[in-house]
């Protein structure tokens, strides 16, 4: 079956039962050696043997967040989804305390609110010590009733988010649950019966009647007092639960604000970086334009100078050619009359006069 959920398993709270464990924790469990070697092919019957071998409980630990065998068996139970009767037998098992906690943890994840209170509250009377592995890999001692208290009042246990649980007094008002009875109430009644028997043996009937009446009144007062104390305790549990939930919400809200501030800061940083890049591109573009203008002006000046040099070189040649031409046609004769006659003859196409 590998890591797939049993095809016959029903959805829990509208989703695959394995999804009650967060994906990152699920992935750590799938990659763990205990899951691959010890949990492969387990059924509801063979799971009991593995549960009896547990010697501690806990979630993930160490730098790589390795899962404990307890957490692996929880995921295996979600995968195969044992029947409710088997889970109840786990909880009622007095011989193996870790089997009891395993069943209570699974019922807290998958059971209804009424079943959770009905089967887990009697475990408040189990004061046996259990070992719990902390997140740093060290062990600490706790008690079964403290683990049950954590399951009923906290939002997280063993790195798994607990489903929302209705308040007990709400279920009592709706008639789904009866007021919780303390186990100490039976001890009080036994002591009162002993006192009554001693009073009957020692005193007269008047004293017996008086003692018979007074214990009854005291018993009623004690019952009322215990009932009120239980109700106050339940309200304290609910108040602590609400305070923890509000604290978690405030923490998540602050984390959300912090993420928004980080996003705004990153966005401003990217905008400023883009502006700097645009300024750099503009400066580079201006620098190239100035360089082109300088090169163009230099080329124009160079061409102008070359043209002037050519003109300066050609003017003496033209003057020389003009002088030579004037010598040939006799227009430069020292005698003005002869020079005038030569100009006239040149215009007529005749040879010039030399003397």
From Swiss-Prot:
The modification Phosphoserine is found at residue 204. Residues 209-227, 234-289, 304-343 have a biased composition (Basic and acidic residues). The gene is PRP38. It comes from the Eukaryota. Residues 185-208 have a biased composition (Acidic residues). GO terms for cellular component: spliceosomal complex. Belongs to the PRP38 family. Residues 290-303 have a biased composition (Basic residues). This is Pre-mRNA-splicing factor 38. Keywords: mRNA processing, mRNA splicing, Nucleus, Phosphoprotein, Spliceosome. Pfam families: PRP38, PRP38_assoc. Disulfide bonds: none annotated. GO terms for biological process: mRNA processing; RNA splicing. Probably required for the first pre-mRNA cleavage reaction catalyzed by the spliceosome. Residues 182-355 are annotated as: Disordered. Interacts with SR45A. It is found in: Nucleus.
């Amino acid at each position: 079956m590998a890591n797939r959920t049993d095809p016959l398993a029903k959805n829990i709270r509208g989703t695959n039962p394995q999804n009650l464990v967060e994906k990152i924790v699920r992935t750590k469990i799938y990659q763990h050696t205990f899951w691959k070697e010890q949990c492969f092919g387990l059924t509801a019957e063979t799971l009991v043997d593995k549960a009896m071998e547990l010697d501690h409980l806990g979630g993930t630990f160490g730098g790589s967040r390795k899962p404990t065998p307890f957490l692996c068996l929880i995921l295996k139970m979600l995968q195969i989804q044992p029947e409710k009767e088997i889970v109840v037998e786990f909880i009622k098992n007095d011989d193996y305390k870790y089997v009891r906690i395993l069943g209570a943890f699974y019922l807290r994840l998958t059971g209804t609110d009424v079943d959770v209170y009905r089967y887990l509250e009697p475990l408040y009377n189990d004061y046996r010590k259990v070992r719990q592995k902390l997140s740093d890999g060290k062990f600490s001692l706790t008690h079964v009733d403290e683990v049950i208290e954590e399951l009923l009042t906290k939002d997280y246990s063993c790195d798994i988010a607990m489903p929302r649980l209705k308040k007990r007094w709400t279920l009592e008002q709706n008639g789904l649950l009866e007021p919780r009875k303390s186990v100490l109430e039976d001890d009080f009644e036994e002591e009162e019966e002993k006192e009554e028997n001693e009073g009957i043996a020692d005193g007269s009937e008047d004293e017996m009647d008086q003692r018979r009446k007074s214990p009854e009144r005291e018993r009623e007062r004690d019952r009322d007092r215990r009932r009120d104390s239980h109700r106050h305790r339940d309200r304290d549990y609910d108040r602590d639960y609400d305070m923890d939930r509000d604290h978690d919400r405030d923490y998540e809200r602050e984390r959300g604000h912090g993420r928004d501030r980080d996003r705004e800061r990153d966005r401003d940083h990217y905008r400023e970086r883009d502006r700097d890049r645009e300024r750099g591109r503009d400066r580079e573009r201006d620098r190239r334009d100035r360089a082109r203008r300088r090169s163009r002006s230099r080329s124009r000046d160079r061409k102008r100078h070359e043209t002037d040099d050519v003109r300066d070189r050609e003017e003496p040649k033209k003057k020389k050619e003009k002088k030579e031409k004037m010598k040939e046609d006799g227009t430069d004769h020292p005698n003005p009359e002869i020079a005038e006659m030569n100009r006239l003859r040149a215009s007529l196409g005749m040879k010039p006069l030399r003397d």
